[in-house]
Amino acid sequence: ASFGEAPPGNPKAGEKIFKTKCAQCHTVDKGAGHKEGPNLNGLFGRQSGTTAGYSYSNANKNMAVTWGENTLYDYLLNPKKYIPGTKMVFPGLKKPQERADLIAYLKEATA
């Protein structure tokens, strides 16, 4: 199923998902440094593997995907399938509602 078929996202629920499943490796704060994973500020509309100052896998650099609702929805289902060779160890979010919530949060928090 595509993002177009996803349930409406709830940013508050997405923030909880981010804090429990993403924040150990990522931040969304403008100007903050990278953690284990890259800072996600400015994520929407950015090409994969291009955040300055972060050492990406060749897989992320070569994928050249532009991050948006549709690409994130597919990526977050199964990151290692979407970008084979990615360094991201997160197994993904199988529930469409959780992916929609996280994307709704990221859209607000990374702008």
Curated annotation (Swiss-Prot):
One of its GO terms (biological process) is mitochondrial electron transport, cytochrome c to oxygen. It comes from the Eukaryota. Keywords: Acetylation, Electron transport, Heme, Iron, Metal-binding, Methylation, Mitochondrion, Respiratory chain, Transport. One of its GO terms (cellular component) is mitochondrial intermembrane space. Its main location: mitochondrion. Transmembrane segments: none annotated. Coiled coil: none annotated. The modification N-acetylalanine is found at residue 1. GO terms for molecular function: electron transfer activity; heme binding; metal ion binding. The modification N6,N6,N6-trimethyllysine is found at residues 80, 94. It is found in: Mitochondrion intermembrane space. PROSITE patterns: CYTC. Binds 1 heme c group covalently per subunit. Belongs to the cytochrome c family. Electron carrier protein. The oxidized form of the cytochrome c heme group can accept an electron from the heme group of the cytochrome c1 subunit of cytochrome reductase. Cytochrome c then transfers this electron to the cytochrome oxidase complex, the final protein carrier in the mitochondrial electron-transport chain. This is Cytochrome c. It comes from Solanum tuberosum (Potato).
